[in-house]
UniProtKB/Swiss-Prot annotation:
Subcellular location: Cell inner membrane
InterPro entries: Cation_efflux, Cation_efflux_CTD_sf, Cation_efflux_TMD_sf, CDF/SLC30A, Zn_transptr_ZitB
Role according to the record: Involved in zinc efflux across the cytoplasmic membrane, thus reducing zinc accumulation in the cytoplasm and rendering bacteria more resistant to zinc. It may contribute to zinc homeostasis at low concentrations of zinc.
Regions crossing the membrane: 21-41, 48-68, 90-110, 123-143, 164-184
Record GO terms (molecular function): zinc ion transmembrane transporter activity
Membrane topology recorded in Swiss-Prot or TrEMBL: Multi-pass membrane protein
Superkingdom of the source species: Bacteria
Protein name as it appears in the record: Zinc transporter ZitB
Signal peptide: none
Source organism (scientific name): Salmonella typhimurium (strain LT2 / SGSC1412 / ATCC 700720)
A GO BP annotation: zinc ion transmembrane transport
Family per similarity comment: Belongs to the cation diffusion facilitator (CDF) transporter (TC 2.A.4) family. SLC30A subfamily.
Gene (name only): zitB
Keywords for the protein's UniProt record, in alphabetical order: Cell inner membrane, Cell membrane, Ion transport, Membrane, Transmembrane, Transmembrane helix, Transport, Zinc, Zinc transport
Length: 312
């Protein structure tokens, strides 16, 4: 029986994540104040809704920035993966906050629909256009140069996207009010934008919960991986006890492999590691090699045979 443990060179997030979050926070916080003033002066719910989104975004971006900074801390004997999971926790909290604030806006919009209030369409238009430009800039900052599926940055970008959609909705509502004077357009557009934001927030919430519960990445088919490994490396007769979860942005795996006793243990382990790295981008894997068939009630819960042996 043999064990192997391989690591990626670094689990630390890229510095550009922190820079993008900081710039986006400055832009979002600044224009949030502008929209609060504009919403109060114009009486527009769409602007106030967008300002509410931006307030949540500013807090979310700050939380995300702190999470990235904490995640840079090196591993310790107590926190052996460092603080990488904190970014996933931040994404979860951000998603919850976005769902709550959006539901509150929908509730207020429904009340506004039945009791319309006067809205200054021209001022609303000016502020909405300025907010749209700010959101476009912040959204571009968060996506520029990003080549990793960081849930934390994704959560922050989702908040900004909600504001971007809110600004578009406010512009459309302002145009309708200016041309027709029909003020219910303001809460109606707020509800339509909120529905779009809720859909994306729910998806993010599911992904972050899956990571917090140490579920396997949605994009990874464990059964297919087991069959692929047994097929590509003939010495591997059986793969079982496979566990995969995410720590920050990196997948982590443990597995047991029943193998034909090799002449060179290290060479076989290296081939398995290379396979996992190049085929599935798993750089952190703990592999236990076994020479006997797996016995016990847990073996068949996660087991694939290459066809070399039969199990009873």
């Amino acid at each position: 029986m043999a064990h192997s443990h391989s690591h990626a060179d670094s689990h630390l997030p890229k510095d550009n994540n922190a820079r993008r979050l900081l710039f986006a926070f400055i832009v979002t916080a600044g224009f949030m104040l502008l929209e609060v003033v504009g919403g109060i002066l114009s009486g527009s719910l769409a602007l106030l809704a967008d300002a509410g989104h931006m307030l949540t975004d500013a807090a979310a971006l700050l939380f995300a920035l702190l999470a990235v900074q904490f995640s840079r801390r090196p591993p310790t004997v107590r926190h052996t993966f460092g603080w990488l999971r904190l970014t996933t926790l931040a994404a979860f909290v951000n998603a919850i906050a976005l769902v709550v604030i959006t539901l509150l806006i929908v509730w207020e919009a429904i009340e506004r629909f039945y009791t319309p209030r006067p809205v200054a369409g021209n001022l609303m238009m000016v502020i909405a256009v300025a907010g749209l430009l700010a959101n476009l800039f912040a959204f571009w900052i968060l996506h520029r140069g990003s080549d990793e599926k960081n849930l934390n940055v994704r959560a922050a970008a989702l908040h900004v996207m909600g504001d971007l959609l809110g600004s578009v909705g406010a512009i459309v509502a302002a145009l309708i009010i200016i041309w027709t004077g029909w003020t219910p357009a303001d809460p109606i557009l707020s509800i339509l934008v909120s529905v779009l934001v809720l859909r994306s927030a729910w998806r993010l919430l599911k992904d972050s919960v899956n990571e917090l519960l140490e579920g396997a990445p949605v994009s990874l088919d464990i059964n297919a991986l087991q069959r692929h490994l047994s097929r590509e490396i003939p010495e591997v007769r059986n793969v079982h006890h496979v566990h995969v979860w995410m720590v920050g942005e990196k997948p982590v795996m443990t597995l047991h492999a029943q193998v034909i006793p090799p002449h060179d243990h290290d060479a076989l382990l290296e081939r398995i590691q290379d396979f996992l790295m190049h085929e599935y981008h798993i750089a952190h894997a703990t592999i236990q090699m076994e020479y006997q068939v797996c016995h016990g009630p847990d073996c068949h819960l996660n087991q694939t045979s290459s066809g070399h042996v039969h199990h009873h």
